[in-house]
Amino acid sequence: MSDMQISGYQSAINARHYIQFAGGGRGPGNPGGGRGPGNPGGGRGPGSPGGGRGPGSPGGGRGPGSPGGGRGPGNPGGGRGPGGGRGGGRGGDGRRRDESFVENEGGRGNRSGRTTSTATTARTPGGLARPTTTVRAPVRPKGPIALPVTMTVREFSEATGVGASEILKALLKAGVVANINQQIDYETAAVIAADFGIETVEYVPPQLEGVVENIRDVLAAQDPKDMKPRPPVVTIMGHVDHGKTKLLDAIRSTRVAESEAGGITQHIGAYQVELHGRKITFLDTPGHEAFTAMRARGAQVTDIVVLVVAADDGVMPQTLEAISHVKAAGVPMIVAINKIDAPNANPDRVRQQLANAGVIVEQFGGDVPSVEVSAKLKKNIDGLLEIILLVADLNEYKANPNAPAVGTIIEAEMDRTRGPVATVLVQNGTLRLEDNVLVGSTTGTIRTMFNDAGKRLRFAEPATPVVILGLHDVPQAGDILQVMPDLAVAREIALQRQRKQRLEAMATSRGVSLDGLFSSIQQGKIKELNIILKADVQGSIGAIEHALSQLNTDEVQIRIIHRGTGTITESDVNLAIASHAIIIGFNARPDPAARRQAEQYGVDIRFYNIIYQLTEDIKKAMIGMLEPEYREVTEGFAEVRNTFRLPTREIVAGLYVTEGKISRQYNVRVLRNGVVLHDGKIASLKRFKDDVREVQAGYECGLIVEGFNDITPGDTMEFYRRERVERTV
C-alpha cells in the first residue's frame, strides 16, 4: 500500500480524541492526579479554590502564591494565584491519549503518548468545578490521497478526514442519497473530495498484469515444447431418471484408479478412473444446470460431454435442453444410450430422435460417437471409456505441468471443524503443499490436499481434482485458483476484487437486452442474435421459428440456441448469461428463482402473446445490426484553370465552379480525361485570401486537396457527399 494511501487512512485515526476531565490535585510533592491532604476529590489544598492541589504540589494547580489552576484565597477559580502564573495543567490521569501534544489555554499537556483536548474549568450553580471540552477537528491529509475503486461513506470519511455528516450533505447536493454505510465509487468520491479541496488518485494494487482471468489464455501462452498430454475432463448430462448418477457410480466402481483401491471414498465433486493405464477425470456434478452455471461465470472446465439417453424413454425435454447447452459450449459430445437391458429398449429409435434434434450419430453418417451401455448391469462401461479416450486423442488435450498451477473451483463449502473446504480441478501447472494461492476474491496457503479416495497428496498435476484446506474464505464454484509468489500481493488483489464486486453489484444490468442491441451492433460487438425461446405449447414454437427465419439476412442471423415449452427456469437464465442471449416467453413466465437470477445478471426476458408483436420487436433490433449503407450525392463540378505551388510544396488549384457548389465538408475527386486520379478530402478552400465554407457556381476559388498535388490546368473536380440510407429487414 502506498504512503499516500496510508497517510489518508491514518488521518482518520489521528482524528479520534479522548476527552479528559480535570480532576483534583495530588498531595505535596506528587505529580498531578491525586488530592491535597484532607481534601475531597476535585477540591484544592488549604486556601485554594476548587481544581488545584495542596500547598506546594506540582501539577495541575498550586497553592496560594503559586502559579496553577486555582488562585490564592478569595480569588475565583481558573485564574492565577497572587503573583502566580498561568492556569495549571493536568498531571497524568491514566486516561487514553494520542501521540500528539496539544498546548491549551487552560493548561499544558504532558507527552504521555495521548491526545489532550482543550479543557477549562467552569463553575456550576452549586459552586463545583465542571470541565468543558472542545474536541479537535479531524486532521485532513496533505497532498493527494489514494482511494480504492469502491468504499463506504465511513471509509471515505476516515481516509479524507472530512466528517461523515459533511460528506453526506455534499452527496445530497450532488443528487446522491446515501447513508454512512453506503458504497460509493471512486469517481463519486473524487468529485466530493475536490469540493473539500482534497486531491485524490485511484489506488491500483500491484502486479495486476500477472493475474489470470481466463485459463484458455494461460494455456495459449504456454510454450508448445513444454506442453504434455493430460487426462480428459468429462461431464455427464441427460434427462432426469435416465441414469446419469447410476452411470457415474458404475464407472467409478469398475474403474477406480488402482492406486486408490481400499481408500475411503470422499465425495469431492470429481474423481478419476483408469483404463489401460490412462486416466479420465469425471466431474461428479451431473446435469446441465451445474455445467451452464459455471459457464455463466466464465469457467471452462469440461473437455467432453457424455449425453445419457434412456433406450426405453428416448429423447425427452431435458435431453433437448442438454443438447442446446452442449452446442452453446462448443465441446465434443458422446451419446451413451443407457438401459439397453430394459424390456422395451429401442436404441435405433433413440438415434432417430437425436437426428431429428440435430445430433447425427456415426451410425447415421454423422460425427457424434454413440455407445450402448447398461449402468444397472455395468455392461459395456469399458467401451464408453475407450470412446472417451479416442475423442481425447483426436483433440490432443495438453497442459504444462511445470508451470505455476492454475485451476477452477468445482465446489466449496464451510466445514464446522476444518473451515473453508474447496474442490479444485488443476488445469495447468502443478499444485503443491504450502503454495500461496489467489482464489477469486479470497486467498490462502495450501495446508492439506487430498483426492476422492481420501489419500493425502503432496502435489496435484493437470486434470487432477483435489480437495484443499487453508483458504481464508469460501470461494464460489467457477472461481479461478492461481498460485502466487507473494501472499501479500494476493491479498491486495483479492481486496480489489471484493471492491470491484461491490461496484458491480451496484450496476443495474450486465446482460444483453433487446433495447441495447442497437448500440452493441453499432460498436461491432454483435452480428448474431441469440434467442432462448420458451412457449406454452410446441405448436407455438414452430410458428415462431418460421416467422423469425423470415427475418434472417446475409449480414444478420437469428440463432435460437434453445427452445422448449413450460416455465422459464434458472437453467434458461444461466444459458442466456453464458451465451449472451435474450429469453422470449410466448405465453410462458419465469419461476421466482429464474426471475431473481435474471434481475441480478441483467438478462432481458421478453413476454409476448401475439407473434406479430414479437417479430416486429426483433425486426427493429435487427435493423440496428445491419451494416450502414451509403449512397453518393453529387453536389458540384469545377474546372482547374491554374495551379500555384506554396512554399510548403502544396499545390493550390485555381478553380472555376461550373455546376452546383463546393463545400469544405464535401469529398473531392480529381479527374483527368474522365479517369479518376484521386478521391479524398478538401484541406483548404479560399476566395482571394479569405477562408470560406462554400463557393457557388459561377465563382472562382482556390483549393488544396489533402495529400494530393498531381493537379494540372484542364483537370476536372467532382464534389460529393455520402448520405446514409436506412436499412430494412
From Swiss-Prot:
Gene3D superfamilies: P-loop containing nucleotide triphosphate hydrolases, Translation factors, Translation initiation factor IF- 2, domain 3. Keywords: Cytoplasm, GTP-binding, Initiation factor, Nucleotide-binding, Protein biosynthesis. Residues 22-91 have a biased composition (Gly residues). Residues 112-127 have a biased composition (Low complexity). Residues 238-245 are annotated as: G1. It is found in: Cytoplasm. Residues 338-341 are annotated as: G4. GO terms for molecular function: GTP binding; GTPase activity; translation initiation factor activity. The keyword Secreted does not apply. Residues 263-267 are annotated as: G2. Residues 92-108 have a biased composition (Basic and acidic residues). InterPro entries: EF-G-like_DII, EFTu-like_2, IF2_II, IF2_N, P-loop_NTPase, Small_GTP-bd, T_Tr_GTP-bd_dom, TF_IF2_bacterial-like. GTP binds at residues 238-245, 284-288, 338-341. Pfam families: EF-G_D2, GTP_EFTU, GTP_EFTU_D2, IF-2, IF2_N. It comes from the Bacteria. Residues 20-141 are annotated as: Disordered. Residues 284-287 are annotated as: G3. Belongs to the TRAFAC class translation factor GTPase superfamily. Classic translation factor GTPase family. IF-2 subfamily. PANTHER family: TR-TYPE G DOMAIN-CONTAINING PROTEIN, TRANSLATION INITIATION FACTOR IF-2-RELATED. One of the essential components for the initiation of protein synthesis. Protects formylmethionyl-tRNA from spontaneous hydrolysis and promotes its binding to the 30S ribosomal subunits. Also involved in the hydrolysis of GTP during the formation of the 70S ribosomal complex. NCBIfam families: IF-2, small_GTP. This is Translation initiation factor IF-2. The gene is infB.
